[in-house]
C-alpha cells in the first residue's frame, strides 16, 4: 500500500508530528514548510526531505498537510497558512488553539478539501485509558461532579477530553452551579476561591455536594497538586 504523502508546516511543536510520521506505516513525510530557520533546515536534511519556505514552491502531489504553527492567540499566522494550503485543494489539519473566526475562515476556504482542527490528545494512550474508564463508570454509577485542571496551552484539549468523558458538550452553562435552575444538582458543584499564602498563589476548589442520607460521606477528600518551576 502506498503511503500517504504528508507536508508538515512548522518545526517547533511540529517536531512531534515529524517524529510520528517518520514512525508511521501509513504516512510518509514529503516535505517541511517553514521560514527557513537553521532548525528547519537541519530537520529537513536529517529526514532527507525538501525544505520549502513558500507554499507556492510545492508542486508535487500532497495528500494532506499538518499546520503546526501558532494561530493568532499565540501570536502566529497558522490559520492563514492553513487557508493558503486549503486554497490549493490540499486537506489540512490545523493545530489548536484557534479562534472561531479562524476556524470559519478555514472552512470557507476549504471547498472540497477536508479541514480539521486537531484534537489529538484524546487519542493518546493515557487519555484513551481515562475515557474508557469514564465510560465503564458511567454504566454503573451516576456522575455527580466533574473537574478540569490544566495549563492554558491545553485548555481546548481539556474541554474536548471532558466532553468525551461526559458523553458530549451539547448543553452547557457557565456560572455558579448553585444558581442554576436547570440542574438537579442546585446547591452542589465546586466553589473556587483564589488567594495568596505567603508569596504563593493558591486556589481552593471546594466540592459542595452533600448526600443528605449520609452527610459524613464526601465524594472527594483531598487533591493538592503543587507545580514547581
Regions found by a protein language model. Name each.
Residues 64-86, 120-138, 157-167:
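Hydrophobic, well-ordered secondary-structure segments
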Residues 8-9, 33, 68, 118, ...:
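Short hydrophobic segments within beta-strands
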Residues 93, 98-161:
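A contiguous active-site-proximal alpha/beta segment in oxidoreductase catalytic domains
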Residues 50-108:
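Beta-loop-alpha module in the N-terminal Rossmann-like domain of NAD(P)-dependent dehydrogenases
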Residues 222-229:
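Conserved small/polar residues in nucleotide/adenosyl-binding loops
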Residues 1-47:
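N-terminal Rossmann-like dinucleotide-binding module
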Residues 3, 29, 62, 87-89, ...:
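A general structural motif
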Residues 143-218:
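Rossmann-like dinucleotide-binding domain that binds NAD(P)(H)
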